[in-house]
Amino acid sequence: RSGWRWCSEFFNHIGIVDTDTNVKYGAYIDISSKNLSNYNNSAITLYKNNITAGPFLWNGSIIPEDHVDMAICSFRSNENRWKSDKVTIPLMCEISHKDGYEEIDRIAKLTFILTNDRICRERISTLMSGKSKVSVLKEFDIIKDAMKDLSNVVDDLLESGSFSVPAIVPLPPKVKLGTNLETEIPGLYLAGESAGISGLLAASVMGIIAGENLIGK
């Protein structure tokens, strides 16, 4: 893993970075599915300004995803060992920073060091009371406020919910791509997360497009 780091450094080295200002970080919330029974297993995503809550992920578990010198939150529900009666809600804040890659790396590493664990799970009430391990980080003030907003639509969130950190969106800087996914360097194509698009389906489709263009050349 940590391909996003390698891509960030490589893109900068060969001079194809278009913008590097996007930073997404936050926390993974989990709460009993009983508190969201009226959502009917919906995988919705809620939006407010620069905050996203979702998609709502049902009946799985938050697990650590190792990235060389730190771990970040991930979600699994595809095996029996991950099954649960909980709903996981990725709560992410998107900000602009002049050095996006360095900033997201800094936030993730600071969180990882402060919690002293691969991923840290705490009660939301500890963050609300200022007693969380990440309460000293000003970057989590906006996450705290977002949890309060989310509690308006999720019953007993602040009282019975938990959150896990570090949580980031590990994507490299944006690169200019043509409609055929070719970069400014002839013959160099990007697909999937290296092109800033998450998901296996996206990676598969983009890989086919890039491959067909390479064969055509």
What is each residue range found by the language model?
Residues 1-217:
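Residues forming the flavin
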